[in-house]
Amino acid sequence: MFETVKNMDDKFCNLSVGFIGKTAGIWNKQGFAKEFKLLEGNPLESVSWRGVDIGFLIADGREKEDVNNLKKAVEAAKNTGISVLIPILISVEQIEVPAPLLTINPENYAGESDIYKNIYQAVKSIYDVACIPGLVNLDLCDVQAVCNDKKKLLLATGEAEGEKACKIAAMEAINKLTKQNGKAQSVGTTVLLNVTGSEANLSMYEIQDVSETIYDWLDDKQTAIIWGASIDESLDDVIRVSILIGE
């Protein structure tokens, strides 16, 4: 019923993802599933989360038992003093859990594969920010600044290539955030922004372009934008922009 995915970088952080109910089986059918190593472990047991810096819990809110188990798993993880815990719930309704919840509304996606691709992008964006050394480093403390003491999270990733790729990728991420919450531009006091690209395709100019696009979008110009930049040579000419906001 339960499986745990763990991706470890001893130098920077330990990020783990727990699956509740059928979500593990669906995740494993996706092409990107092999990017994470599966571990045996029950996310409802605190021992599974010991030593974890950043934890994700994925559940399907359309299964009532899964919602209850998600809440239990959150408590189990929190009992270990985990630095950051992000539950991800596939649900049309907003449900409260004792941790900052990222809700994935299935009605906003084309199908199951699209839903899980979005979840994968959420996990990967946080992993890239906190666990991979970058051109301009963000770290665990930056993720904590946005997530801790929050009830809800908004997280989106945009990608583009070619002319004005940075601005286009930023706008794609913004559009996804707006789809999650029509008032996304005004809900947070701190925004975490990460720009990823190949070394040949990413400079301070591109990063500044993205930052200005996000700044112009935000209602409150006093909102703190914590930004970083990561190098990923596999992206070639693609620029990836990830935005995290806590409510």
Annotate each predicted stretch with a short phrase.
Residues 1-247:
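Tubulin/FtsZ superfamily GTPase core signature
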